[in-house]
UniProtKB/Swiss-Prot annotation:
Protein name per the record: Multifunctional methyltransferase subunit TRM112-like protein
Effect of E92A: Reduces interaction with THUMPD2, THUMPD3, ALKBH8, TRMT11, N6AMT1 and BUD23. Increases interaction with METTL5. Reduces expression of exogenous TRMT112
Any Gene Ontology biological process: rRNA methylation
Modified residues (Phosphoserine): S119, S125
SUPFAM superfamilies: Trm112p-like (SSF158997)
Organism: Homo sapiens (Human)
Domain TRM112 stretches: 2-119
Domain of life: Eukaryota
GO molecular function, one term: tRNA methyltransferase activator activity
Subunit structure: Part of the heterodimeric BUD23-TRM112 methyltransferase complex; this heterodimerization is necessary for the metabolic stability and activity of the catalytic subunit BUD23. Part of the heterodimeric N6AMT1-TRM112 methyltransferase complex; this heterodimerization is necessary for S-adenosyl-L-methionine-binding to N6AMT1/HEMK2. Part of the heterodimeric ALKBH8-TRM112 methyltransferase complex. Part of the heterodimeric METTL5-TRM112 methyltransferase complex; this heterodimerization is necessary for the stability of the catalytic subunit METTL5.
Length: 125
């Protein structure tokens, strides 16, 4: 699971609502998986990043040199875009868990895929 994906996921356990974000990330296996650099794509994703969730996830993974927010003129700043490309798209959680901050519900990550399926009792009606 890429950090970009993590930044978009939230819990939909019944009664949680908007308090199901951000999911707490705990990884037992992380890999760096090279991806072709696409500065236009990264620049388009920057405004969508929820920075507090991103920084918390990066801290949980013990990543270093993580920008605290978008730099001015980031669209033309190749160094910033490459750093964000690496963090959002190349750092992959292979095994671990995501935890709902409100309900405590754990969602497993297996082979890079987060399992967000809920039982019928957990779903919102």
């Amino acid at each position: 699971m890429k950090l970009l994906t993590h930044n978009l996921l939230s819990s939909h356990v019944r009664g949680v609502g908007s308090r199901g974000f951000p999911l707490r990330l705990q990884a037992t296996e992380v890999r760096i998986c090279p991806v072709e650099f696409n500065p236009n794509f990264v620049a388009r994703m920057i405004p969508k990043v929820e920075w507090s969730a991103f920084l918390e996830a990066a801290d949980n993974l013990r990543l270093i040199q993580v920008p605290k927010g978008p730099v001015e003129g980031y669209e033309e700043n190749e160094e910033f875009l490459r750093t964000m490309h690496h963090l959002l798209l190349e750092v992959e959680v292979i095994e671990g868990t995501l935890q709902c901050p409100e309900s405590g519900r754990m969602f497993p990550i297996s082979r890079g895929i987060p399992n967000m399926l809920l039982s019928e009792e957990e779903t919102e009606s």
